Every structure is written in structure tokens, then in C-alpha cells.
């Protein structure tokens, strides 16, 4: 079952948002 372009794009977008949120949360906790 191959992934469609939409599913791949959605997965990358979600991973990007999650990374940004975790990075901001980490910097706030570090301060």
C-alpha cells in the first residue's frame, strides 16, 4: 500500500510543527 503525495506532505507538515513546538517548549524550560 504505497503512500500518496498528500499523506507524505501531511506527515512532513505534522513533524515540522511538532518539532517547532517541542523546540519552543524546550527553550522556555531551559530559561
Swiss-Prot record:
The chain crosses the membrane at residues 10-27. Pfam families: PsaM. It comes from the Eukaryota. It is found in: Plastid, Chloroplast thylakoid membrane. Keywords: Chloroplast, Membrane, Photosynthesis, Photosystem I, Plastid, Thylakoid, Transmembrane, Transmembrane helix. GO terms for biological process: photosynthesis. One of its GO terms (cellular component) is chloroplast thylakoid membrane. It is a single-pass membrane protein. Its main location: plastid. The keyword Signal does not apply. The keyword ATP-binding does not apply. Belongs to the PsaM family. This is Photosystem I reaction center subunit XII. It comes from Ostreococcus tauri.
Amino acid at each position: 500500500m504505497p503512500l500518496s503525495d498528500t499523506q507524505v506532505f501531511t506527515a512532513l507538515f505534522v513533524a515540522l510543527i511538532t518539532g517547532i513546538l517541542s523546540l519552543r517548549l524546550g527553550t522556555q524550560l531551559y530559561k
